[in-house]
């Protein structure tokens, strides 16, 4: 289970975010990006000591400042179910051709497009012809 897939599933659900400086933010996840920057709505911020509280309509948190996230168990269960169905990353997949290329066997002996192959079949030295020697006429 990948953290970003977990966050994508957790959109519009409540969560708690603790920052590296000790502050905590409780709110509903609006969106997140690949760097784990997140937007929350209906946020309650708690100071490091736990003695001060602020209510904010919305909040943006940079991903690199996050220490941990607390997400409801039902979200984690939803992600596990999706992964079991094969929709998540790395689940059971059917063999299918992907991307570009020659379509046949992938890497292997002399089947690809790279270097190597049958010796002497490339653009190397020309073959010596019998009967003539270089330098004598």
Curated annotation (Swiss-Prot):
Q: Does the keyword Secreted apply?
A: no
Q: Where is the composition biased (Gly residues)?
A: 100-123
Location of this chain's protein in the cell: Nucleus
UniProt key word RNA-binding: yes
GO biological process annotation, one example: mRNA splicing, via spliceosome
Under the GO molecular function aspect, what terms does this record hold?
A: RNA binding
Task: Cite the residue spans of the region called Disordered.
Answer: 82-137
What does the entry list under GO cellular component? cytoplasm; nucleoplasm; nucleus; spliceosomal complex; U2-type precatalytic spliceosome; U4/U6 x U5 tri-snRNP complex
The task this protein performs is described as:
Plays a role in pre-mRNA splicing as component of the U4/U6-U5 tri-snRNP complex that is involved in spliceosome assembly, and as component of the precatalytic spliceosome (spliceosome B complex). The heptameric LSM2-8 complex binds specifically to the 3'-terminal U-tract of U6 snRNA.
Name the family: Belongs to the snRNP Sm proteins family.
Outline the subunit composition: Component of the precatalytic spliceosome (spliceosome B complex). Component of the U4/U6-U5 tri-snRNP complex, a building block of the precatalytic spliceosome (spliceosome B complex). The U4/U6-U5 tri-snRNP complex is composed of the U4, U6 and U5 snRNAs and at least PRPF3, PRPF4, PRPF6, PRPF8, PRPF31, SNRNP200, TXNL4A, SNRNP40, SNRPB, SNRPD1, SNRPD2, SNRPD3, SNRPE, SNRPF, SNRPG, DDX23, CD2BP2, PPIH, SNU13, EFTUD2, SART1 and USP39, plus LSM2, LSM3, LSM4, LSM5, LSM6, LSM7 and LSM8.
Protein name (database record): U6 snRNA-associated Sm-like protein LSm4
Gene transcribed to yield this protein: Lsm4
